[in-house]
A protein has these predicted regions:
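Charged C-terminal helix
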Residues: 6, 54-57, 243-276
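Conserved phosphate/ATP/ADP-binding segment of small-molecule kinases
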Residues: 122-208
Length: 276
């Protein structure tokens, strides 16, 4: 590979002191894909495999300055957005990404941690859907997040697919609803907006694609959502279309889960470097 042409991927997310999720998981994932990782940190969290004990948001001005510094020099080919718990920070992220005409934006709507801790207030959730979702190439909610976004019960593959289609219709972006919270399955469904006619109207319902992978029986699941969304961003940065990018991201996460680390007293981390 020509080292002057290595794609960069920007992660806009919170820092995880235990290294298993957030910015740290994103950097590991991007590096494992042999791409160049850049960051804009939105919050500092004190957390480990047992849960989150403290969150300190970064000043919105500093978040904006980080994004500007990245785009002004080493422009990313894709952007992954993770934990953003402040409406004001969401507003500046949307403003800066719009100003720089950012492409290939993957939004992981981090609303609730695996441990159950809630990361986002109601006003921030509203800003997330109003400002960031319209900029996204794809959003990647898990089932609890999809239910919270839609106020809709998801308890089967049929309702999971309906949720993905509803999200795509409502927010205008592709939606990947992850099925890992089902007991016996790890199947995800992608809904993409239908093509547009000459007047800008969608020609039919969203197009859906299922991604079926075997469920890895492990308790080491810390950072799985961060890892998958970053892996999808990496694939988009390398020029894959969205469905292929999701499939590649799923395959990477499956390997990382299978090789996960038995570390800590709770939900341990996945092994981001499992291919090496």
């Amino acid at each position: 590979m020509d080292r002057s042409k290595v794609p960069a991927v920007l992660s806009i997310a919170g820092s995880d002191s235990s290294g298993g999720a957030g910015i740290q998981a994103d950097i590991k994932t991007i590096t494992a894909h042999r791409l160049y990782a850049e960051t804009a940190i939105t919050a500092i969290t004190a957390q480990n495999t047992l849960g989150v004990t403290a969150v300190q948001n970064i000043s919105p001005d500093i978040v904006a300055a980080q994004i500007d510094a990245v785009f002004d020099d080493i422009r990313p080919s894709a952007v992954k957005i993770g934990m953003v718990s402040s409406a004001e920070i969401i507003e500046v992220i949307a403003d800066r990404l719009s100003a720089w005409d950012a492409q290939n934006i993957v939004v992981d709507p981090v609303m609730v941690a695996t441990s159950g801790a809630r990361f986002i207030a109601e006003d921030a959730a509203e800003a997330l859907t109003r400002r960031l979702f319209p900029l996204a190439t794809v959003i990647t909610p898990n089932i609890p997040e999809a239910m919270a976004l839609l106020d809709y019960e998801v308890d089967s593959e049929r309702t999971q697919q309906n949720a993905a289609m509803l999200l795509t219709r409502r927010f205008g972006c592709a939606s990947l609803v992850k099925g890992g919270h089902f007991v016996n399955e790890a199947n995800d469904v992608l809904a993409e907006p239908a093509p547009l006619d000459d007047e800008g109207n969608h020609l039919g319902d969203p197009l859906t694609t299922w991604f079926r992978h075997k469920r890895i029986e492990t308790g080491n699941t810390h950072g799985t959502g961060c890892t998958l969304s970053s892996a999808i961003a990496c694939a988009l940065a390398q020029g894959m279309d969205l469905a292929d990018a999701v499939n590649a991201g799923k395959a990477y996460l499956t390997g990382a889960l299978a090789a996960g680390f038995d570390m800590g007293k709770g939900s341990g981390p996945v092994n981001h470097m499992w291919q090496y």
